[in-house]
Amino acid sequence: MTTPTPLRSVTVNTPPPYTIAIGPGLLHDPPRLAATIRGRHALILSDSEVAPRYAAQLHETLLRARPDLHLNVFTLPAGETSKSLENFGAAIAQLATLGATRDACLFALGGGVIGDLTGFTAACWMRGIDYVQVPTTLLAMVDSSVGGKTAVDIPQGKNMVGAFHPPRAVIADTDTLATLPLRELRAGLSEVIKYGAIRDPVFFHWLQTTREALLARDPAALAQAIARSCEHKADIVGRDPLEKGERVLLNLGHTFGHAIETTQGYSTPGSNNLNHGEAVAVGMVLAARLSNTLGLAPAEDTETLKNLLDAYGLPTVLPSGLKPETLLERMRLDKKNIAGRLRLVLWRGIGHAEAVPDVDEAAVRQILAN
């Protein structure tokens, strides 16, 4: 007899605090979902991959608990290209048509793209309304749904237009991971590995020994990976909600990764372009190699990180055809830079990272070229 996976809960102590609920069956929990709604209007935002599977269930559960609710569903095409100013405007128009007031609530049903767009829409409508993250990808469960960063992309860069706006709650129904494509599961595991790499050697070792169970979607292993990742992010975000200090460490691999994404073009369903988790995996290896070159991290730890990412089926080398100078141009636009100088999150070995200002571009160029 299979032991049921217990519900896990993680509190994020930002102003205001909120709770991350992690476990199976949460899309079928009317009291939990209804408790997040203060007013009479709600809008579910989802995408063309997720909505056919889960939007009707969320819609039904909400109306079962709140029959008086004015509730619509807005579905966007799947993929990073939907995280645009155009679709932000379309979501705002949906709220206007709904007649949403300041006590309305948005539900982000999907991955990081939907979560970011929904959060930014909530931050802007009437100067800020509630939204609930209902992540359906592993990457969104462990990273983008937690912390209150919201944004859309522009052609010049990823997440360039955004706001800090914490969700009212995060409700992560782990049953949705059963339908997640393997490539997307691996992308989420890239962000899970990041937490071990930057601050938890014990978790890093656990990921080395639990690979088969995680890739096989063992419910207990996945719940543990999600909960531990969320605990790490909640701990950091609770102390640094606006990324003025240590929260920047969560960006290990992201400066390189965002440059890869914007240079190659954003990944869409069926595309061979690297998705976010894959680009971060490559970025972590590049950051580790640069750290080794600068004398910050031991070479054997860099090799250990690369081997772990390889073992999970993640890419660890730059895609062919990306020019170092083009990538550097994108990196110069990164939000973490100071006074026009590169500021990168680099590595001190397994379990340790630091933000390094004024990184030598020649050293970065050499890493990108090799």
UniProtKB/Swiss-Prot annotation:
Give a yes or no for keyword NAD in this entry. Answer: yes
Role: Catalyzes the conversion of 3-deoxy-D-arabino-heptulosonate 7-phosphate (DAHP) to dehydroquinate (DHQ).
Name the keywords, alphabetized.
Answer: Amino-acid biosynthesis, Aromatic amino acid biosynthesis, Cobalt, Cytoplasm, Lyase, Metal-binding, NAD, Nucleotide-binding, Zinc
Sequence similarity = Belongs to the sugar phosphate cyclases superfamily. Dehydroquinate synthase family.
Instruction: Indicate which residues the UniProt annotation says bind NAD(+).
Output: G112, V113, I114, G115, D116, T136, T137, K149, K158, T176, L177, A178, T179
- State the encoding gene: aroB
Q: Where in or outside the cell is it found?
A: Cytoplasm
Q: What is this protein called?
A: 3-dehydroquinate synthase
Kindly list the positions annotated as binding Zn(2+).
E191, H254, H276
Provide one Gene Ontology cellular component. cytoplasm
Q: Which cofactor does it need?
A: Co(2+); Zn(2+); NAD(+)
Q: What is its main location?
A: cytoplasm
Q: In which pathway does it act?
A: Metabolic intermediate biosynthesis; chorismate biosynthesis; chorismate from D-erythrose 4-phosphate and phosphoenolpyruvate: step 2/7
Give the molecular function GO annotations: 3-dehydroquinate synthase activity; metal ion binding; nucleotide binding
Residues annotated as coiled-coil are none
Annotated cofactor note? Binds 1 divalent metal cation per subunit. Can use either Co(2+) or Zn(2+).
One GO biological-process annotation of the entry reads: amino acid biosynthetic process
Report the domain of life of the source organism: Bacteria
Q: What is its EC number?
A: 4.2.3.4
